[in-house]
Amino acid sequence: MTYLLNERICALFRSNWQHTLTYWSVFFSFGLCVAFLGPTILDLRCQTQSTLQEITLVFFSQQFFLFLGSTIGGFFSKTLVSSLSSLAVSTLIISVVFAIIPLCRELLMLAFAMAVSGLAMGTIDTISNLQLVKIYQKDSTVFLQALHFFVGLGALVSPLIADPFLSDTSCVIGNSSVNTTSLEDLRNKLAGRHVHNVSNVHLHTDGEVVTNVSYAFWIMAIINLPVPIAIFVLVYRERLFMCGSDPSRRLLDGDVLAIKPRGTSILAEDTGQKETSNSHADLFSCCLLGKAHSFPLSFFGIHVLGGLVLFFSDGIVGSYTGFVYTYAVAPPMNLPHKTAGYLTCIFWAAITTGRLSAIPLSYRFKPVRLLIVSQVGVIVTVLLLLIFSNSSVFLFIGTCCLGLFISSIFPCMLALTEDILEYKGCATTVLVTSAGMGEMVLQVLVGSVMHSRGSFSFLLCGMIFGCLGFTFFTFLYFVQQSHKSYTEALPGNSPVERHEENGIKTCSAAVLNSWDAPEHKTSLDP
């Protein structure tokens, strides 16, 4: 069975390899944008000749517009041409932003550039997740894990590119200088996504600017440039230009036809098209109040609960990357600044490794099982960090374990929720938006609590967020059972039949027709 499963997934990938690789490369661009701001923020402060308090506003600018981009990204995904066009424009914008950042000599110009990049990142986040889910459906977990692996890969590559060009001493030469050690400590402190409590840090704002960080941004712009080119090639290959194609072509039309064999009968083609229409025609109908009466409460409950799970899980990721350094250098840890600076890198490396290792695990285990292990692992890890709060060694071990456990929650949750809703509604848009909101809101909350209650509250907040996430996941399980019973009881609205060939469930009617084994087809209980 495992061999046949791998064979089917490989067949799906071969039929959609260009789409899939394009979406993965797009998320690499997303990862580049995620991590470049922290290491380069001091050089950008010098470039704009602003204070440290003022330059940290660009963090909020990028994060807020990333949230907005995640929200509006779903509205560009109704057709294949609009989806690919949005991705091409967004990735091209990222390259342009990288190229013009060295030219932004004013703080407002830099904040505007970060806002534009955040908007592009949010659009990429929603559309890429949505397209992979719609292509692979039941098998999307494997490909979503790989998709989010490329985020971590980009987040690791970006600081490595920037590091050789960062200033070792004060990059604004004034009447006096800031020693190298202080600048390195500040850069380590700014390695997170958000920065607080910097009002007591004073650096020169007037004087001669000496920085080579421009080369880092231009290199990243060049590295990212093949991504929009690849998308335009894909658009050309699919013949989606407006002058020679139907602009209303649905998102899955090309994908379903791509995996349909040449010998498929007309009846099978009609069946596949009917299923596609029923499953995806009303992608955003759950967001329209006029049609709300046609859905049960459990339908909306699944959206809300799934969003809350990712709200807290991504909130943990954001707050941990933003404040683990502050926690490590404060009592009772009192780690050296340079040593504490490695924690954020270790956390991102663990997330990247976890997503890579989750790819083969997704072949063997259902998303719900991976989610249970991940959620429990997060809670246990944070609990152990609380118990061994005086151990600097366990802080590094716990950081690594936390990254490994939390890495696969987002892709598994996305695949599970879409599967429950049978790929109807706007689950992907809601989940991606909720994750972005959690990352933005909970970072501010943790920063405020740490400022008023001390560094120990950092882990306590993580424990509370982890428990809340697992609680909402438990509620989701019971609501899912209620939703399943409701949909099965509706007259004339039985769930889409799932077939099994040689013990393997197919993900769509088109895929079913691509397997030449007409015998032993039986329906399966989802």
UniProtKB/Swiss-Prot annotation:
Protein localization: Membrane
Pfam families: MFS_1
Entry's transmembrane regions: 21-41, 55-75, 84-104, 107-127, 142-162, 215-235, 297-317, 341-361, 377-397, 401-421, 430-450, 458-478
Gene that this sequence comes from: mfsd4a
Organism of this sequence: Danio rerio (Zebrafish)
Name of the protein: Major facilitator superfamily domain-containing protein 4A
Alphabetically ordered keywords of this record: Membrane, Transmembrane, Transmembrane helix, Transport
GO cellular component: membrane
Topology term for the membrane: Multi-pass membrane protein
Family label: Belongs to the major facilitator superfamily.
Gene Ontology MF, one: transmembrane transporter activity
Source domain of life: Eukaryota
Lineage: Eukaryota, Metazoa, Chordata, Craniata, Vertebrata
InterPro entries xref list: MFS, MFS_trans_sf
